[in-house]
Amino acid sequence: KLFILKRKSKLGLGSAYSDGYKWALSKNSTNNGIEYDKKYIYDNIYTMDADFSHNPKDLLRMKVFLTENGMDLVIGSRYKTGVNVVNWPIQRVLLSYFGSWYARFITRVPIMDLTSGFVGYKINVIRDIMKKGIEFNGYAYQIEMKFKAHVLNYKLYEIPIIFTDRTKGESKMNKSIIPEAVFGLLKMKLKNVFSRL
């Protein structure tokens, strides 16, 4: 079945993800809103681009690692085996690749593609991250989700994918995301460090 969440306005990428997660978490055995200790109808949650930049066939590979190989979070990685991106201009490739490198350097999460939006989660991972709360609402949201899963000692794994850019429409990503990534990630990391002292 396909369920479509209608939102009143565009409130940011992170807000859209959070609304989707909250909807899935609300589908527990009692169907009575978000109750973090209930049994959920959905075992896993997957996020992906709806323009087929992410190949739906790769969902099956993700599922194997979540259900059979003991992983808690599986990332469709553009950079695990090099740079596997089709139809991106070089400046977009560089922004994404070095953005992931910077995020990895700051967070120390051993993942090559921390900015990937093609991710499979066990639902308890989403539950525990949502309990802690999410700070970012832009593209850094993706990094924060993986960082917090890592901090919570969940098992993260990357599978290589080929990302093919859309043939119609335009990406909303631009250089305005850089300040959030540069300064926001530093703040997030420092906050985590001092919370453990």
Model regions and ranges:
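Residue-level signature of catalytic and energy-coupling elements of molecular machines
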Residues: 20, 51, 122, 149, ...
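Short beta-strand-to-loop acidic/aromatic patch adjacent to the donor-nucleotide binding site
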Residues: 32-51
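Cofactor-binding loops of NAD(P)H-dependent oxidoreductases
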Residues: 7-9, 48-50, 159
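Catalytic donor-sugar/metal-binding loop of nucleotide-sugar-dependent glycosyltransferases
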Residues: 110, 133-137, 146-163
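Conserved residues at the C-terminal ends of beta-strands
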Residues: 48, 77, 162
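An aromatic- and histidine-rich active-site surface loop
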Residues: 52, 61, 143-144
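C-terminal catalytic/acceptor-binding lobe
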Residues: 152-197
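Acceptor/aglycone-binding surface of glycosyltransferases and processive sugar-polymer synthases
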Residues: 2-3, 7-26, 40-42, 56-139, ...
